[in-house]
Amino acid sequence: SKELLEGFRRQGFAVVSVNYRLFPKCKCPDYIDDAAMAVAWTFENIEKFGGNKEQIYVSGHSAGGYLTLMVALAKEYMAKYGQDADKIAKAYPISGQTVTHYTIREERGLPDGIPVIDEYAPMTHAGRGGAPMILISGDRDLEMLARYEENAHLQALLQNFKHDSVLYEMQGFNHGTVLSPAVALISADIKKLWKQYQKQ
């Protein structure tokens, strides 16, 4: 999202903006592979641009939030490109689906609105460790159907497995307008973590 890109750039962060193939020109898991390949590329190349591979943070909104979760929790996708998803400093999915994405259900000809939880659902991979994360959702009364509730379910699973995670519900913000407060929240958290890293 351009709002994420510009929001983080204004905070002084080096930002790698990622595109991925879209259905119907491709099918699952091509777009998950694209996201994992991009994060792996960042680990391999960010130091050439003055970045620090120990300080790589991953975020995305909506479908990008789903891909953020899959890259961080389903570690086999990063491993395919020779990188360890556990090396991600922190993940910040914004309003991401935590069940199998509705695009995948559409590919299978399944009806809209009925959740599927299989290997393409981020919550399936809870309990396997992974990067610390902040789950961010819009207001449960303004978000897309069950989006807050899905994130709350994932957070409950992560907490059960002692995963370093927290869920923020941005009250008064819908699926689209959640981006502005999300950028502020994420930026503040990264700056705090950067200060801690520098003291090590």
Identify the residue ranges that each predicted region occupies.
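Loop/turn elements at helix/coil->beta-strand transitions in domains of secreted/extracellular proteins
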Residues: 11-16, 53-55, 86-90, 130-133, ...
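C-terminal catalytic histidine-bearing segment of alpha/beta-hydrolase fold enzymes
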Residues: 152-155, 159-200
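The feature captures the conserved acid-bearing segment of alpha/beta-hydrolase catalytic domains
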Residues: 82-104, 113-152, 156
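Residue-level signal for short, function-critical loop segments
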Residues: 62, 139-141, 173
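Short beta-to-alpha linker loops that shape the active-site pocket of alpha/beta-hydrolase fold enzymes
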Residues: 14, 19-23, 97, 171-173
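Catalytic nucleophile-loop/oxyanion-hole region of alpha/beta-hydrolase
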Residues: 1-5, 16-53
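Primarily recognizes the serine-hydrolase "nucleophile elbow" in alpha/beta-hydrolase
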Residues: 37-107, 118, 122
